């Protein structure tokens, strides 16, 4: 089994990366393979709404990094999306992925999705809701934890001081692993 973790934050290796890797630790303990993608390293243009992707399983526009990232999403059993807010790159990924999935029905069906946010104080629920709506609209299964899938902190590393939030991420990783084993 494989889980792709996508850091939508513009801050590479910041708080969002820390919480995704915290979830990865729990998945790795159960023998689940993980791969980390930093969207800050990937150029993703907005969707052109050409619908040429219909029946092809991926976007036909190959001048940016979307097709490679989406191929990894399709090939994974589970997907973690993380963003402090819905960053422009995350928004482009969700928009284009949404169109590709809509015209290629079932391509993401029954995959497991987890949305997480690392925030200073506010905005996390909007980000988590947006990413969860992507999952649910594409017939995916969404894993939850003991509380909202958010951790608080501003400066890089501050999220590690949010003991409750980090414990929640660990629990989320354990829940994700349990669900993946039941699905597979």
Question: Model-derived features: where do they sit?
Answer:
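Glycine-rich phosphate/pyrophosphate-binding loop and the adjoining helix
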Residues: 1, 24, 29, 62, ...
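N-terminal beta1-alpha1 ligand-phosphate binding loop
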Residues: 2-30
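Cysteine-centered iron-sulfur cluster-binding motifs in ferredoxin-type domains/subunits
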Residues: 8-17, 45-54, 77
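Hydrophobic residues within alpha-helices
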Residues: 19-27, 93, 131, 176
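N-terminal beta-loop-helix "entrance" segment that forms/cooperates
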Residues: 39-58, 154-161
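Helix-loop-strand module that forms the ligand-binding subsite of alpha/beta enzymes
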Residues: 60-146
